[in-house]
């Protein structure tokens, strides 16, 4: 058989879709997961409208091109990680494959990703789109958390390659804490945190709006996003951080310069407390969301405590970060410190309650950071889809035609170096 073309790896997220070919270290494209369509509410006879419908179906844009299209309606087919509008998703995939990857779908196997707790019906819909509309030869739907674990093997902190660990996946729209044992997600213990990149942007926007008058209102969101991505970091201690800024402001306060979209004049703002207060809402959610007050370190601890007792130690030892919102400087260090404090306090308490008769063995808490975090899921998919095993576990077009879309309800785990 001639050399196989590499598989296509597509990771669709709420905010951005990462796409590229297996075997590469980074995605060829990272585009916003949005689609601009013509919404025709024209009055006319049926035949005329049917003709228009056919034309309108081809008249759409995705990604960056879709964001500033004045006569189009911009839609985001994915919310909180889960696909909501399948018709739009099909059209989105069409341009992903033909316009961006420039691939002939009949020639490439595909690895797509799914969020935790995705329904089996959604997998069937995905299979129908890929096999019926695009006629792909093989499809594998991978769980994002497992791919993020595989991506963490690039970190120097990882000794053995294991698919057991706790994945903190924080993107633009949702943050999940997902325990994985031997490549299988422990579904009943997953917790989701209603704080993600978008909330940090909104919170930063609020802080800037209260203080900086010079930002043009229509640009306040993109300014907040740029400030967050460029200057934000996680601090070890809030009170000390405030006093650092108060005593030596010139050293810590940064300047951000933007251009007014209307008048084309430059505007300049000072970025102070916002730098550390933005990401702080992971550790003090009550700053931004009065309904949710549990810090991320407590959520991680609770998730692991809910898991079967024999996997708890490995889960503490391998806490893996994934997604753009975990990229803040010192995020991993602060999380490790906070989880360690919670765990040590519990061990100390059990020792005291036993009157000193029990000496619990200390628990090793390790948060793993690596340079692939931003697109860890995509990179994990790229690694696994370039192994020969991948082609053995893929669901093929032949299976699909014989059995139907239900074959994609289950995707076997592979890639554990056994």
From Swiss-Prot:
Q: Which SUPFAM superfamilies match?
A: Actin-like ATPase domain
Q: Which UniProt keywords apply?
A: Actin-binding, ATP-binding, Cell projection, Cytoplasm, Cytoskeleton, Nucleotide-binding, Nucleus
On whether Metal-binding is a keyword of this UniProt record, the answer is no
Keyword Glycosyltransferase in the entry? The reply is: no
A GO molecular function annotation here is: ATP binding
Under the heading InterPro entries, the entry gives: Actin, Actin/actin-like_CS, ATPase_NBD
A Pfam family found in this protein is Actin
Kindly list the places in or outside the cell where this protein is found, as annotated in its UniProt entry.
Answer: Cytoplasm, Cytoskeleton; Cell projection; Nucleus
Tell me which Gene3D superfamilies the record gives. Answer: 3.30.420.40, Actin, Chain A, domain 2, Actin, Chain A, domain 4
Q: What GO CC terms are in its UniProt record?
A: Arp2/3 protein complex; cell projection; cytoplasm; nucleus; site of double-strand break
A GO BP term here is:
Arp2/3 complex-mediated actin nucleation
The UniProt similarity line reads: Belongs to the actin family. ARP3 subfamily.
The record's subunit annotation is:
Component of the Arp2/3 complex composed of actr2/arp2, actr3/arp3, arpc1 (arpc1a or arpc1b), arpc2, arpc3, arpc4 and arpc5.
Role: ATP-binding component of the Arp2/3 complex, a multiprotein complex that mediates actin polymerization upon stimulation by nucleation-promoting factor (NPF). The Arp2/3 complex mediates the formation of branched actin networks in the cytoplasm, providing the force for cell motility. Seems to contact the pointed end of the daughter actin filament. In addition to its role in the cytoplasmic cytoskeleton, the Arp2/3 complex also promotes actin polymerization in the nucleus, thereby regulating gene transcription and repair of damaged DNA.
What name is this protein filed under? Answer: Actin-related protein 3-B
Supply the gene name. Answer: actr3-b
């Amino acid at each position: 058989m001639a050399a196989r073309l590499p598989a296509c790896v597509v990771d669709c997220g709420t905010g951005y879709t990462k796409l590229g070919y297996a075997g590469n270290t980074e995605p060829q494209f990272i585009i916003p997961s949005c689609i601009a369509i013509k919404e025709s509410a024209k009055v006319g006879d049926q035949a005329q409208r049917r003709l228009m419908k056919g034309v309108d179906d081809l008249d759409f844009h995705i990604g960056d091109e879709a964001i500033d299209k004045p006569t189009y309606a911009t839609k985001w087919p994915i919310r909180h990680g889960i696909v909501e509008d399948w018709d739009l998703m099909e059209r989105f995939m069409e341009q992903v494959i033909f316009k961006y990857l420039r691939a002939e779908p009949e020639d490439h196997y595909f690895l797509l990703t799914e969020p935790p707790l995705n329904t089996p019906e959604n997998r069937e819909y995905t299979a129908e789109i890929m096999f019926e509309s695009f006629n792909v030869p093989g499809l594998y739907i991978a769980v994002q958390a497992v791919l993020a674990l595989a991506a963490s093997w690039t970190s120097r902190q990882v000794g053995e390659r294991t698919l057991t660990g706790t994945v903190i996946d924080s993107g633009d729209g949702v943050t999940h804490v997902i325990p994985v044992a031997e490549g299988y997600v422990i579904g009943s213990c997953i917790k989701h945190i209603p704080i993600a990149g978008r909330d940090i942007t909104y919170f930063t926007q609020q802080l800037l709006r209260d203080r900086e008058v010079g930002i043009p209102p229509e640009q306040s969101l993109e300014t907040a996003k740029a400030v967050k991505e460029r200057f934000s970091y996680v601090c070890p201690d809030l009170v000390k951080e405030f006093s650092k800024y108060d005593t030596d402001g010139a050293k810590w306060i940064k300047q951000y310069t933007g251009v007014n979209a209307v008048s084309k004049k430059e505007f300049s703002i000072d970025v102070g407390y916002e730098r550390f207060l933005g990401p702080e809402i992971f550790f003090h959610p009550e700053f931004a969301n009065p309904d949710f007050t549990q810090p991320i370190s407590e959520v991680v601890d609770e998730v692991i405590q809910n898991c079967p007792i024999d996997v708890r130690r490995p889960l503490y030892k391998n806490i893996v970060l994934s997604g753009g919102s975990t990229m803040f400087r010192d995020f991993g260090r602060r999380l490790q410190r906070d989880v360690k404090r919670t765990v040590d306090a519990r061990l100390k308490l059990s020792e005291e309650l036993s009157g000193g008769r029990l000496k619990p063995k200390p628990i090793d808490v390790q948060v793993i950071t690596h340079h692939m975090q931003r697109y860890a899921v995509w990179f994990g998919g790229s690694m696994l889809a370039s192994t020969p095993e991948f082609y053995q576990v893929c669901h093929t077009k032949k299976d699909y035609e014989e059995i139907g879309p239900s074959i994609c309800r289950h995707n076997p785990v592979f890639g554990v170096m056994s």
